Design a protein with these regions (language model features):
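Exposed beta-sheet edge and beta->alpha loop/turn motif
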Residues: 82-115
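A solvent-exposed, acidic/Ser-Thr-rich amphipathic alpha-helical stretch
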Residues: 24-84
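Short, low-complexity N-terminal intrinsically disordered segments enriched in polar/charged residues
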Residues: 1-34
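General structural signal for alpha-helix termini and helix-helix connectors
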Residues: 14, 37-40, 97
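Short, highly charged low-complexity linear segments
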Residues: 12-14, 70-77, 112-115
Length: 115
């Protein structure tokens, strides 16, 4: 297998859907108990107890200047899997509005997923 399967992509898609809609129901079951998130908003590193809740609150604040977010995923890069753990980089194109002005952002997300 060279790509994440649909079970691996489901939480990624739900996370992106939360980011686009701020609908908390999309976050159910998305985050692992042992969680680390690196972000572009303070405090930039979210880990340990309460990381998911702190990231959510930070993102909601960050998203106040964003609108009409649409993610587009490319083919996964650097996919590897061992036992119940998988790693991959997911090229992502975000488009939408920032402070009312159209933007496009090209980047990538790195994921380590465990079953």
């Amino acid at each position: 297998m060279n790509e994440p399967d649909e079970d691996m992509m489901a939480p990624v898609r739900r996370l992106a859907r939360f980011m686009a809609t701020l609908d908390d129901s999309n976050l159910e079951g998305v985050f692992a108990e042992d969680l680390t998130i690196v972000e572009n908003f303070a405090p930039f590193l979210f880990r340990g107890d309460g990381a998911a809740q702190a990231w959510r609150a930070g993102f909601v604040e960050h998203a106040k200047t964003l609108g009409e977010l649409v993610p587009e995923f490319g083919s996964a890069q650097d996919f590897s899997r061992e036992d119940q753990t998988a790693y991959f980089v997911l090229p992502t194109r975000w488009s939408g509005k920032s402070r009312g002005r159209p933007f496009t952002e090209l980047g990538g997300w790195s994921f380590i997923l465990t079953r």
